[in-house]
Amino acid sequence: VTTPLLPPPITAVAAVDTTLRERGHGVLDPAGLHQCLGAPAHALDAWWGYWDRLAPDLHLRDGGHYRQRRHGGFIVDGARLTAAPHRAHWQPLEYNALHGGIERWFEPLEPGLVAEPLWPSLLLWLASRASALRGVQPWFIEAHPFRIDTAGGIGRPTPEGAHRDGVDLVAVMLVRRTGVKGGETRVFDADGPAGLRFTMSQPWTTLLLDDER
């Protein structure tokens, strides 16, 4: 018996900023994200190949080999997007008890991905959402393409468990699901028992989170 997936509550494009302010989170469906980027339907599917060429995550403290990723940083100042020098990813222990407190170096993003026409559109749009939430200012964006491989049994997208990232805004985008069971997303209030659970199943479904909440 297959348990049906619980779909996410979809946020209307016009209500994204209001929903983030009022609830601390919102979910765009694929059509909504493409609309926000001014792109035709399925345009982002051209990015799928980059997720076939991610590098092994060598920093998993649970001894696993199920996660591949790359990493890149960008600065958005107004309408200007600049690639930052490649650097380590670092989180304090208070936000990530398993992987915090160490410099984690990952392979950089492929130049081809950064050169994709919709790449700056996505990052500038996300920076605009952060400015709507916190006020207009320059933003530093870290991009983390992930791939979780379940071929060996169990893959853990977040082996550190429920945690905050210590940033202003988090965007979680589902690129694709292939041969995967589970993969449930859970959103928790930082200071209370309230929460939300659902499964993103359609490519380019996007969860936006006010990380402080």
What name fits each language-model region?
Residues T2-A143, A151-I154, A190-M200:
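Fe(II)/2-oxoglutarate oxygenase catalytic core
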Residues V27, P145, V170-V172, T206-L208:
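Conserved hydrophobic/aromatic beta-strand scaffold that supports enzyme active sites
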Residues P145-R147, M173-V175, D189:
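Short, structured patches in soluble enzyme cores that scaffold and shape functional sites
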Residues P145-R164:
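Conserved short histidine dyad/triad with adjacent acidic residue
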Residues G153-T158, K181-V187:
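A short secondary-structure junction signal
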Residues P157-T158, V170, L174, P203:
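Short, hydrophobic/aromatic alpha-helical segments in well-folded domains
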Residues R164-V180:
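Short, conserved beta-strand element in jelly-roll/cupin
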Residues E184-R213:
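Catalytic core of Fe(II)/2-oxoglutarate
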